[in-house]
Amino acid sequence: MHIERVKESTLGSIDFEKLDFGKIFTDHMLICDFDGESWGEFHIEPLKPITMHPASSVLHYGQAIFEGLKAYKNDDNQVNIFRLQSNIARFNESATRMQMPSLDPDKTLLAIKKYVALEKDFIPTKEQGSLYLRPFMISTDHTLKAVSSKKFRFMVIACPVGFYYDKPLNIFLEQTHRRAARGGVGFAKAAGNYAASFYPTELARDKGYDQILWTDITNGCTLEELGSANFFYVKDGAVHTPEIHDSILKGITRDSVIQLAKAKGL
């Protein structure tokens, strides 16, 4: 893999005791381009703005997907990436639904591990937080025709982050607006899913709430998921969570909680 390193790191300017989520970035980015037939080689270069043609299809039709996962330092100062394989698998499921090319799981796994190894000094201690990884793919054809792009770019950028929430949340039960519908793209981490949620989320925040608990599109009586997480509740000593279907994201943390709960006999 070709790696172009920055001439001067930004590491020394970061206050790891004050990490605002998603606003502080590491020195480099991982890139791989799809030319319409096959993926090129992964490479790493210094983080910088990307240039795009105004007719790039992603700007008009939203053919874009992403993932989110974290790397941590353990007690031995070794780096652990939480369930990277599962995130790559889910990314490819999103790609299929959005008519985008799948990534080679093994090559992608190795490339992301090399990228994280390069940026390991940006990983906070476990008391401070973690390194948030944002893999994403965008369509890059230059056309205003409403068709699937043939060319795509896959990238990974990273942010040292603190803890996303520092207090319990006030949750608003949303029964007017809907996040997703059966047969749609709710199970995919498609960029537009999140843009569509901003307006009702802001309405909830104006009422003093932190997050929305979304309900089903049919009658608003079936609980689905939160804006930034899957939903669990405990009743009569048992742990419950909505069944996964195509309007609910297949949460990797959700799956981890279920495995742990079963292991503990819950």
Spans of features found by a protein language model:
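Extended, Lys/Arg-enriched charged tracts that mediate electrostatic binding to polyanionic substrates
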Residues: P124-R134, I138
